[in-house]
Structure formats: C-alpha cells, structure tokens
A protein has these predicted regions:
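PLP-dependent amino-acid enzyme catalytic core
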Residues: 1-107
C-alpha cells in the first residue's frame, strides 16, 4: 500500500488488503470494495516500518517520530506520552505472570 498509494496502514489491515488482492487476481472479480482499517500504524510502529523499509528504530517513540515524518498523523495520546515518567517498569515471563502479579499486589 505504501509503495503504490503512499498510504501507511497497520499490520492487520495489510493482511486484509493482501487477501483481497490475492482474491482479485485469482477470481478476476472487479467488484468495488471498501477496506476498513482495524488499527493505527502507531499501534505496531516497529512492524509497520520494518515492512515498509526493511528496518525500524528499536525505540517505539523513534518509530512514532518516523511515522509522523512520513505524514501519518500522530494520535494525541502518543504525543502526550513522550517525556512522561514511567510509572511501572516490571517485566516478567508470561509463565510467571500470575505469580508476579500476586507478589506485586501484596506490596
């Protein structure tokens, strides 16, 4: 979509577009179709930029800045997060999630 239309879409919508394009080629069906996006490119910025350019910044805010520089409107919620203090930085493996949360809740 980016190469043809210079329009940036999220990863979920890109799957839908690919399925539709494959269907059109296989069936010859030229029926007018409307594709609705299911998310913003800002939801998966690293994946979106990697798909377009083959690489992407490691930092999510750097990815957001890159999307913005491409003309993709930045959601106000993302812009407001930049520079804010991180309140919770606890990270755990998914198989330890219940145990970790119980320990955290006891504090």
């Amino acid at each position: 979509m980016w190469e043809k239309e210079h329009y940036c879409i999220d990863t979920h919508t890109s799957v839908g577009c690919a399925v539709y394009e494959n269907y059109k080629k296989a069936s010859g069906d030229g029926t007018f179709t409307v594709m609705l996006s299911t998310a913003s490119p800002y939801k998966f910025p690293h994946s979106v930029l990697s798909a377009i350019f083959g690489t992407a910044p490691a930092d999510e805010f750097d990815c957001a800045d890159k999307l913005k520089s491409m003309g993709v409107e930045e959601p106000v919620q993302i812009a407001e997060l930049k520079g804010k203090k991180v309140l919770h930085s606890l990270v755990c493996d998914k198989d330890k999630m219940a145990e970790t949360m119980l320990t955290w809740a006891e504090k």
